From Swiss-Prot:
Record-given protein name: Deoxyribose-phosphate aldolase
Active site: 102 (proton donor/acceptor), 165 (schiff-base intermediate with acetaldehyde), 199 (proton donor/acceptor)
Domain of life from the UniProt record: Bacteria
GO CC annotation, single: cytoplasm
The reaction(s) this protein catalyses: 2-deoxy-D-ribose 5-phosphate = D-glyceraldehyde 3-phosphate + acetaldehyde
Protein source organism: Aliivibrio fischeri (strain MJ11) (Vibrio fischeri)
Enzyme Commission designation: 4.1.2.4
Family matches, as PANTHER family: DEOXYRIBOSE-PHOSPHATE ALDOLASE
Pfam family of the protein (one): DeoC
Amino acid sequence: MSDLKAAALRALKLMDLTTLNDNDTDEAVIALCKNAKTAVGNTAAVCIYPRFIPIAKKTLREQGTPEVRIATVTNFPHGNDDIEIAVAETKAAVAYGADEVDVVFPYRALIAGDETTGFELVKQCKEACGDVLLKVIIETGELKEEALIKKASQICIEAGANFIKTSTGKVPVNATPEYARMMLEVIRDMDVAKTVGFKPAGGVRTAEDAQAYLAMADEILGDDWADNMHYRFGASSLLTNLLNTLEVTEETADPSAY
């Protein structure tokens, strides 16, 4: 198997296959769940709005892939600084049956110099999650500066985040290799690689993209680190392109897709 094919297969099994469109329907979510099961293995998770968790759970169970995890989003995509609402949404997501919650960090508060709100929001959302995995979206494309991206990553980790995630996919600039490197370096420098994972989201579209991101993780945190409890790709169109690289399909995805 070529290096690119090996990377494509590895990336496929690390995907949070995502649909977070305002016009999502039960049918769209059922189709997403069916796509999570492929001839070469399953994606790690599907990522959907909370109201679709029951239909996703049913579909995954009926198709014989109950191990595909269900991720959902809270405080999304705005990243407001109302802790009470973020916690209430997170509790509701857990009650719906989410295995993982991706919450948006109050990044505008941090830009304005407020570090406390973000810490408290993440801490209380993690308490609401219990054993449910909490991924925190710091919105790198809005923070922009290395100092802010590293500070947000540190705050999330100190407050108990299980993963730090680049982006919502709803702003002009989402994951980039530069932002990924900054966040991975924080995980390394804080010596939390055993307990904290990383998720680039939005902008990872091809097998070559995924290969480059995984090579970076291997370089910074070691070859065995990026397993499905420490690394995820948040994407939708990536799956079609990975399957194309693996010669399972001849399709390629719309280059503008998430």
